[in-house]
Amino acid sequence: MCVEKQKADFGVYEKQALENQTGLYLTRPEAYAEPVLCACVMDAEGKEKDRIFPLPLENEISFCMRVEQPKLWNAEDPYCYQLILEILEGENFSHDRRTESLAFCDWKIVGGLTCINGKAVNFRATALPEGKKASEVQQFLRIMKQTYKNTLLINSDKRSSQLERWCREYGIYLLEEGKDADAGWLRARLDMDRENEKNPDFQLQVVQTGVLIENHSTFVNASEYNLHYEILDSSGKKCSENELCTDVPAGTSKFVDIPFQCPAEPGEYRYQVSLCLKRDVIWAPKGYVIASSETKISNLYERLENENQ
């Protein structure tokens, strides 16, 4: 896949301060006599995937960059690359440096269904309210992700490069009225008012010996999250907790045995199991709960059995 015809009009890019990373391409002692444009593509792990040789700076520059076998983007796992652009002159002096997120995604309509990377997806949509400032739009997208919405519906005049960037980074499908009618705009619009109190992608059923994990997501393995379990007393005080990682591919279910010990004190306890983020993401911190369930357990019966033996 190629990134083609990127303009040197830096107005479309968001400026980011990246310390001690200037001068990507000055590989000889001679300085650049005239301003040049340098560019590279980095993956999410910070590994360089491609670069161009310095190009003389012009009002408009076309170039092609290639990423071999790119990791594909979807709303459940919004993997983004970074296009880094820099203007250099003199002895590695940087006039300007900008970055733009890139995503590779195969979006097709197959039999009336929207397929992303070869899999049919369900849109859980909400509409972008009128008159929101940039900071308010980001907060709106954050709440969307936390309430299990994956699709933003917009009017044509609301589309912008900044909104597209945010949707890529947050993991949100963007549908435009009229233009994306075949892609599912109407179906998403009709389904817009449905509220999801629980995450429709993951369902947990907890019993005393473990948890049944039903993975209804399209792309993501449950191993992308930590399985956190804890025991709390009747006052809500935490008696014990631990975490483990479990393998439950998308579209499957699995019962997971969870090793734990009942508290020594007799009584009823809450046994709570959650799937939590393994790392910070743009819309929530590490440890944020994306799905949870609980049951009550008691050690009274077990203690009576032991006393009668």
For the regions a language model picked out, list residue spans one by one.
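Secreted/periplasmic carbohydrate-active enzymes, especially glycoside hydrolases
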Residues: 1-176, 180-309
